[in-house]
């Protein structure tokens, strides 16, 4: 069984072509050095040809080069100093704005009758550290997620080592009447919407969203600038993903970096700890499109 966990950022379903364990095991086998196509059996070559269509690998002169980065423990050791500096620079920006976040969280909490610290987590983690900063990076150093045939448009990366205890992301779904439903997801948490009779979650109207967007947009811009300038200090040629797709590499490092920062925010008491056991409504909210 493969030890890697894959993540994506964007829209679509990367597992559309690669739902079997055979893909994971093959990719782990050829990463990072690559492999001569002639050394693979027929079923493995079929997987490689599928991977090539969605730019997971590059096949040139009968040699297979893996293009999706995988983060390993040796990689972590080589960028640990970078992560520490990155964390410090991110925290400087967050501390500069945190009172504004507390104030807005308090305002929304009073209106929604939802705990203030929960609203604060949504504002800082979901809107700012994740979606807001990623949006700014897509306007700059990242560009838009690459098209992967009919499986969607997304960045993709894998991890063999989880350096953060609080890795998270945000998924958004459309619901009727011009509303959007969002949820903070974490890999270790499995949710089921079956047999749920009611949910107590915040609903952000257009007036609230205007305040939220104004706050996270400016903060995310600063964080994106920190990431973009700091990434230049990483010696990519020394890492396992040196020859992988640069966009996927940058997206991976962005997600690893902000999750690392999240741990620090929790340790310092700025953020409440993510629950080990959650209700089905934790990390969910509805907002105007």
Residue ranges of each PLM-predicted region?
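Active-site ExK catalytic segment of metal-dependent nucleases
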Residues: 57, 76-83, 163-169, 177
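Short acidic, hydrophobic short linear motifs in intrinsically disordered regions
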Residues: 26-44, 210, 214, 218-225
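Accessory beta->alpha helical hairpin/"wing" motif in late/C-terminal subdomains of nucleic-acid enzymes
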Residues: 7-12, 58-80, 210, 225, ...
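Short amphipathic alpha-helical interaction segments
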Residues: 37-61
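Short, amphipathic alpha-helical interaction segments positioned at domain boundaries
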Residues: 66-105
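Short alpha-helical segments that sit at the start of domains
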Residues: 1-26, 195-206
